[in-house]
């Protein structure tokens, strides 16, 4: 029976610890694999990524370009028809609240968009913020309705 105190790592999954400074013949004696002197041989002797020895670094030499709107852009969550087919019964009304209850939409979002990936055989009444043309066509072919909140 598997118990916490009997669990062992797979063979070859763990590396042996390097024993540094244990004599010259160990292969890791004297300088312990750090070479001779210099900043990288000292304790705490690492330089930050991108540091070029005092020269103006590349990321500061290149010009700033473009515009970044990630803090203010709308977060639109995607739902596919295949997910609706799997979760909802025929005749159901699908909106943001029912999608959250079914765990198809999680976390904060500004809008929900329905995409046409998959097939739909049930007639559903879908109320979303955005819908693709293929999704709208498939829902209406299955006998359902699509209401877009931004158009209403």
From Swiss-Prot:
GO terms for biological process: translation. The keyword Iron-sulfur does not apply. GO terms for cellular component: cytosolic large ribosomal subunit. One of its GO terms (molecular function) is rRNA binding. Residues 24-36 have a biased composition (Gly residues). PROSITE patterns: RIBOSOMAL_L15. Keywords: Ribonucleoprotein, Ribosomal protein, RNA-binding, rRNA-binding. Residues 1-66 are annotated as: Disordered. It comes from the Bacteria. Binds to the 23S rRNA. Belongs to the universal ribosomal protein uL15 family. Part of the 50S ribosomal subunit. NCBIfam families: rplO_bact. This is Large ribosomal subunit protein uL15. It comes from Akkermansia muciniphila (strain ATCC BAA-835 / DSM 22959 / JCM 33894 / BCRC 81048 / CCUG 64013 / CIP 107961 / Muc). The lineage of its organism: Bacteria, Pseudomonadati, Verrucomicrobiota, Verrucomicrobiia, Verrucomicrobiales.
